[in-house]
Protein backbone atom coordinates (compact mmCIF):
# COMPACT_ATOMS: atom_id res chain seq x y z
CA UNK A 1 0.00 0.00 0.00
CA UNK A 2 1.47 3.36 -1.00
CA UNK A 3 1.52 6.50 1.12
CA UNK A 4 -1.42 8.04 -0.78
CA UNK A 5 -3.61 5.03 -0.03
CA UNK A 6 -2.56 5.06 3.61
CA UNK A 7 -3.50 8.71 4.04
CA UNK A 8 -6.74 8.24 2.15
CA UNK A 9 -7.69 5.61 4.71
CA UNK A 10 -6.59 7.87 7.57
CA UNK A 11 -8.76 10.74 6.35
CA UNK A 12 -11.64 8.30 6.50
CA UNK A 13 -11.29 8.32 10.28
CA UNK A 14 -12.49 11.93 10.41
CA UNK A 15 -16.23 12.46 10.79
CA UNK A 16 -16.99 15.52 8.67
CA UNK A 17 -19.99 16.47 10.78
CA UNK A 18 -17.98 16.43 13.97
CA UNK A 19 -15.18 18.39 12.29
CA UNK A 20 -17.63 21.14 11.32
CA UNK A 21 -19.20 21.04 14.79
CA UNK A 22 -15.77 21.52 16.38
CA UNK A 23 -15.12 24.51 14.11
CA UNK A 24 -18.55 26.01 14.86
CA UNK A 25 -18.09 25.62 18.62
CA UNK A 26 -14.62 27.16 18.36
CA UNK A 27 -15.98 30.28 16.67
CA UNK A 28 -18.88 30.41 19.11
CA UNK A 29 -16.36 30.49 21.93
CA UNK A 30 -14.31 33.15 20.18
CA UNK A 31 -17.36 35.40 19.77
CA UNK A 32 -18.30 34.81 23.42
CA UNK A 33 -14.85 35.88 24.64
CA UNK A 34 -15.55 39.66 24.63
CA UNK A 35 -18.34 39.04 27.14
CA UNK A 36 -15.94 37.00 29.28
CA UNK A 37 -13.45 39.87 29.30
CA UNK A 38 -16.05 42.61 29.77
CA UNK A 39 -17.80 40.81 32.63
CA UNK A 40 -14.51 39.52 34.06
CA UNK A 41 -15.76 35.93 34.29
CA UNK A 42 -12.80 34.64 36.26
CA UNK A 43 -13.31 30.87 35.78
CA UNK A 44 -12.96 31.43 32.02
CA UNK A 45 -10.12 33.95 32.30
CA UNK A 46 -7.83 32.12 34.68
CA UNK A 47 -6.49 29.31 32.49
CA UNK A 48 -5.72 31.19 29.24
CA UNK A 49 -4.05 34.08 31.06
CA UNK A 50 -2.08 31.75 33.31
CA UNK A 51 -0.72 29.58 30.51
CA UNK A 52 -0.02 32.60 28.29
CA UNK A 53 2.06 34.23 31.03
CA UNK A 54 3.91 30.96 31.58
CA UNK A 55 4.68 30.59 27.88
CA UNK A 56 5.86 34.17 27.53
CA UNK A 57 8.08 33.68 30.56
CA UNK A 58 9.72 30.51 29.28
CA UNK A 59 9.85 31.07 25.52
CA UNK A 60 12.82 33.26 24.65
CA UNK A 61 13.03 34.40 21.00
CA UNK A 62 16.80 34.20 21.35
CA UNK A 63 16.74 30.52 22.29
CA UNK A 64 18.04 27.91 19.81
CA UNK A 65 15.67 27.14 16.95
CA UNK A 66 15.22 23.46 17.81
CA UNK A 67 14.57 24.22 21.47
CA UNK A 68 11.78 26.66 20.58
CA UNK A 69 10.36 24.24 18.04
CA UNK A 70 10.39 21.37 20.54
CA UNK A 71 8.66 23.43 23.23
CA UNK A 72 5.89 24.73 20.98
CA UNK A 73 5.38 21.36 19.31
CA UNK A 74 5.26 19.53 22.65
CA UNK A 75 2.76 21.93 24.22
CA UNK A 76 0.40 21.81 21.27
CA UNK A 77 0.75 18.04 20.88
CA UNK A 78 -0.19 17.50 24.53
CA UNK A 79 -3.13 19.87 24.25
CA UNK A 80 -4.53 18.13 21.18
CA UNK A 81 -3.93 14.67 22.62
CA UNK A 82 -6.12 15.72 25.54
CA UNK A 83 -8.83 16.59 23.00
CA UNK A 84 -8.75 13.01 21.75
CA UNK A 85 -8.70 11.37 25.20
CA UNK A 86 -11.49 13.66 26.41
CA UNK A 87 -13.86 11.66 24.22
CA UNK A 88 -13.87 8.99 26.93
CA UNK A 89 -15.91 11.47 28.97
CA UNK A 90 -18.46 12.00 26.15
CA UNK A 91 -19.33 15.69 26.61
CA UNK A 92 -15.79 17.00 27.01
CA UNK A 93 -14.77 17.36 23.31
CA UNK A 94 -17.61 19.82 22.48
CA UNK A 95 -16.85 21.70 25.69
CA UNK A 96 -13.14 21.80 24.85
CA UNK A 97 -13.92 23.09 21.34
CA UNK A 98 -15.90 25.99 22.79
CA UNK A 99 -13.29 26.74 25.46
CA UNK A 100 -10.49 26.69 22.89
CA UNK A 101 -12.19 29.53 21.05
CA UNK A 102 -12.74 31.40 24.31
CA UNK A 103 -9.15 30.96 25.47
CA UNK A 104 -7.45 32.07 22.26
CA UNK A 105 -9.79 35.03 21.79
CA UNK A 106 -9.29 36.11 25.42
CA UNK A 107 -5.54 36.22 24.87
CA UNK A 108 -5.99 38.22 21.65
CA UNK A 109 -8.26 40.68 23.45
CA UNK A 110 -5.82 41.10 26.31
CA UNK A 111 -2.83 41.50 23.98
CA UNK A 112 -4.20 43.79 21.26
CA UNK A 113 -7.42 45.12 22.78
CA UNK A 114 -9.76 43.77 20.09
CA UNK A 115 -10.76 40.53 18.44
CA UNK A 116 -9.41 40.54 14.89
CA UNK A 117 -11.18 37.64 13.22
CA UNK A 118 -9.24 37.45 9.98
CA UNK A 119 -5.76 37.50 11.57
CA UNK A 120 -7.13 34.95 14.02
CA UNK A 121 -7.80 32.40 11.29
CA UNK A 122 -5.87 33.52 8.20
CA UNK A 123 -2.23 33.44 9.23
CA UNK A 124 0.20 30.65 8.30
CA UNK A 125 0.23 29.08 11.76
CA UNK A 126 -3.55 29.14 12.20
CA UNK A 127 -4.12 27.56 8.80
CA UNK A 128 -2.22 24.53 10.06
CA UNK A 129 -3.09 24.45 13.75
CA UNK A 130 -6.82 25.13 13.60
CA UNK A 131 -7.53 22.16 11.30
CA UNK A 132 -5.28 20.02 13.52
CA UNK A 133 -7.28 21.11 16.58
CA UNK A 134 -10.61 20.44 14.89
CA UNK A 135 -9.42 17.02 13.71
CA UNK A 136 -8.37 16.06 17.24
CA UNK A 137 -11.70 17.29 18.61
CA UNK A 138 -13.65 15.41 15.93
CA UNK A 139 -11.75 12.24 16.81
CA UNK A 140 -12.65 12.82 20.46
CA UNK A 141 -16.31 13.34 19.55
CA UNK A 142 -16.33 10.09 17.57
CA UNK A 143 -14.86 8.33 20.57
CA UNK A 144 -17.47 9.89 22.85
CA UNK A 145 -20.26 8.73 20.56
CA UNK A 146 -18.99 5.16 20.82
CA UNK A 147 -18.81 5.41 24.61
CA UNK A 148 -22.41 6.62 24.71
CA UNK A 149 -23.79 4.09 22.22
CA UNK A 150 -21.70 0.99 22.88
CA UNK A 151 -19.89 1.44 26.17
CA UNK A 152 -16.26 1.74 27.16
CA UNK A 153 -15.13 -1.72 26.04
CA UNK A 154 -15.97 -1.08 22.38
CA UNK A 155 -14.86 2.54 22.61
CA UNK A 156 -11.42 1.58 23.88
CA UNK A 157 -10.87 -0.59 20.82
CA UNK A 158 -11.82 2.42 18.68
CA UNK A 159 -9.40 4.60 20.66
CA UNK A 160 -6.38 2.85 19.16
CA UNK A 161 -7.70 3.49 15.66
CA UNK A 162 -8.35 7.14 16.51
CA UNK A 163 -4.85 7.37 17.94
CA UNK A 164 -3.51 6.44 14.50
CA UNK A 165 -5.31 9.46 13.08
CA UNK A 166 -3.79 11.65 15.77
CA UNK A 167 -0.27 10.35 15.12
CA UNK A 168 -0.33 10.57 11.32
CA UNK A 169 -2.68 13.51 10.69
CA UNK A 170 -2.56 15.81 13.70
CA UNK A 171 1.10 15.57 14.68
CA UNK A 172 2.50 16.31 11.19
CA UNK A 173 0.34 19.44 10.99
CA UNK A 174 1.58 20.55 14.40
CA UNK A 175 5.20 19.84 13.48
CA UNK A 176 5.00 22.03 10.38
CA UNK A 177 3.04 24.72 12.25
CA UNK A 178 5.70 24.88 14.96
CA UNK A 179 8.38 25.14 12.27
CA UNK A 180 6.54 28.08 10.68
CA UNK A 181 5.92 29.77 14.02
CA UNK A 182 9.53 29.54 15.18
CA UNK A 183 10.70 30.81 11.79
CA UNK A 184 8.42 33.84 12.21
CA UNK A 185 9.59 34.40 15.78
CA UNK A 186 13.21 34.35 14.62
CA UNK A 187 12.56 36.54 11.59
CA UNK A 188 10.38 39.13 13.32
CA UNK A 189 11.77 38.95 16.83
CA UNK A 190 8.26 38.45 18.24
CA UNK A 191 7.10 36.50 21.22
CA UNK A 192 5.11 33.30 20.55
CA UNK A 193 1.62 33.62 19.15
CA UNK A 194 -1.45 33.21 21.32
CA UNK A 195 -2.01 29.72 19.96
CA UNK A 196 1.07 28.23 21.64
CA UNK A 197 0.11 25.65 24.20
CA UNK A 198 -3.57 25.85 23.35
CA UNK A 199 -3.64 24.02 20.07
CA UNK A 200 -5.36 26.67 17.98
CA UNK A 201 -4.49 29.66 15.84
CA UNK A 202 -4.21 33.36 16.47
CA UNK A 203 -3.09 36.61 14.97
CA UNK A 204 0.44 37.88 15.32
CA UNK A 205 1.27 40.26 18.09
Predicted regions and their residues:
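N-terminal signal-anchor transmembrane alpha helix
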Residues: 9-45
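Residue-level signal for the membrane-embedded core of alpha-helical transmembrane segments
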Residues: 23, 92-95, 131-138, 167, ...
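Alpha-helical transmembrane segments of multipass membrane proteins
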Residues: 25, 29-33, 132, 173, ...
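Transmembrane alpha-helix/helix-exit interface in multi-pass inner-membrane proteins
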Residues: 35-42, 83-106
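Membrane-interface interhelical connector segments
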Residues: 39-63, 67, 104, 108-110, ...
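Interfacial helix-start motif at the membrane-water boundary
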Residues: 56-86
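Alpha-helical transmembrane segments of helical membrane proteins, especially in multi-pass transport
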Residues: 121-145, 177
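Terminal transmembrane helical module of multi-pass membrane proteins
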Residues: 141-205
